[in-house]
Amino acid sequence: MEARAIAKFVRIAPRKVKIVVDLVRGKQVDEALAILKHTPKGASPVVIKLIQSAVANAENNHEMDREQLFVSEVYANQGPTMKRFRPRAMGRATTIRKRTSHIGIVVKEK
């Protein structure tokens, strides 16, 4: 049995989120939360909240034991890119791409 949680349209670039999610893939849930708590990255609080949501889904919806849960799948896919423009010299403008992510976590029992 598995439980999942998904955060969509998170305003962090997927390249930056992938660095954080690679740290917790395959880890026990409590160990993953401890690792993320001490990781100084902007995506860490988002992934912590997502793991807590997946654990709550497992406990409440599927009656799983928290001690047996581990992170079986975790992914950070690219969402839509918001395009903004920055004025530059001589009447030009450059595009600023504000990237978003879709982050998903699946927890399973051992």
Curated annotation (Swiss-Prot):
Listed SUPFAM superfamilies: Ribosomal protein L22 (SSF54843)
MF terms (GO), sorted A to Z: rRNA binding; structural constituent of ribosome
Coiled coil: none
Stored InterPro entries: Ribosomal_uL22, Ribosomal_uL22_bac/chlpt-type, Ribosomal_uL22_bac/org-type, Ribosomal_uL22_CS, Ribosomal_uL22_sf
A Pfam family reported for this protein in Swiss-Prot or TrEMBL: Ribosomal_L22
PROSITE patterns (UniProt xref): RIBOSOMAL_L22 (PS00464)
UniProt KW keywords: Ribonucleoprotein, Ribosomal protein, RNA-binding, rRNA-binding
GO biological process: translation
Highest taxon of source: Bacteria
GO cellular component terms, semicolon-separated: cytosolic large ribosomal subunit
Role: This protein binds specifically to 23S rRNA; its binding is stimulated by other ribosomal proteins, e.g. L4, L17, and L20. It is important during the early stages of 50S assembly. It makes multiple contacts with different domains of the 23S rRNA in the assembled 50S subunit and ribosome.
Subunit structure: Part of the 50S ribosomal subunit.
HAMAP family for the chain: Ribosomal_uL22_B (MF_01331_B)
Family label: Belongs to the universal ribosomal protein uL22 family.
NCBIfam families hit by this protein: rplV_bact (TIGR01044)
Protein name per the record: Large ribosomal subunit protein uL22
Organism: Alkaliphilus metalliredigens (strain QYMF)
Gene name as annotated: rplV
